[in-house]
UniProtKB/Swiss-Prot annotation:
Record gene name: yqgF
GO MF terms held by the record: nuclease activity
Free-text function comment from the UniProt entry: Could be a nuclease involved in processing of the 5'-end of pre-16S rRNA.
Protein name, entry field: Putative pre-16S rRNA nuclease
BP GO terms, sorted: rRNA 5'-end processing
Superkingdom of this protein's organism: Bacteria
Species per Swiss-Prot/TrEMBL record: Buchnera aphidicola subsp. Cinara cedri (strain Cc)
Length: 130
C-alpha cells in the first residue's frame, strides 16, 4: 500500500512516500509553497503518479500556531481535490530530528530538510497505525 506524507510549511512543503508491503519509506521532494498556489500542480503530478491509498499530513498538536489553520485548510483541499482519505499526524520535533540526521550526513540543505521531516512524520504514523 502506498502512503504519501506532506510536511506543510509556510515556505516549503516536504513530501515523503512509503510502500508498506516493502516496509520502506523515503523522502521524495520538497516544493516551494508560494502565494500563487502553483504547488498544487506539482502535488497533482505526485498524487497521480503514485496513487496513494492514504495521505498523512504533519500537524503540530502541542504547539498553537497560525500554521495550524493553514494545515487544516491544506488537508481539506487534498480531500476535496483528490478524494483520498487523509490523517493528521503529530509532527512535533520532526524538524529537529531531520536536522540531526542532516548533521550526521554532513548535508545542510534546508530544501531537503522538509522532505526528511515528512519521512519522519510518515514513519511515526506507520508505526502507530499499520
Amino acid at each position: 500500500m502506498i502512503i504519501l506524507c506532506f510536511d506543510y510549511g509556510i515556505k516549503i512543503i516536504g513530501i515523503a512516500i512509503a510502500e508498506t508491503k516493502l516496509n520502506y519509506s523515503t523522502p521524495i521532494k520538497s516544493i516551494f509553497n508560494n502565494k500563487k498556489k502553483n504547488f498544487w500542480n506539482q502535488i497533482n503530478i505526485i498524487i497521480n503518479m503514485w496513487k496513494p491509498k492514504y495521505i498523512v499530513i504533519g500537524y503540530p498538536y502541542k504547539i498553537k500556531k497560525k500554521i495550524n489553520k493553514k494545515i487544516k485548510k491544506f488537508a481539506k483541499e487534498i480531500k476535496k481535490k483528490f478524494k483520498i482519505n487523509f490523517f493528521l499526524c503529530d509532527e512535533n520535533y520532526s524538524t529537529t530530528e531531520a536536522l540531526l540526521f542532516l548533521k550526521e550526513k554532513k548535508k545542510k540543505k534546508k530544501y531537503c530538510l522538509h522532505s526528511i521531516s515528512a519521512k519522519i512524520i510518515l514513519d511515526s504514523w506507520i508505526r502507530k497505525n499499520i
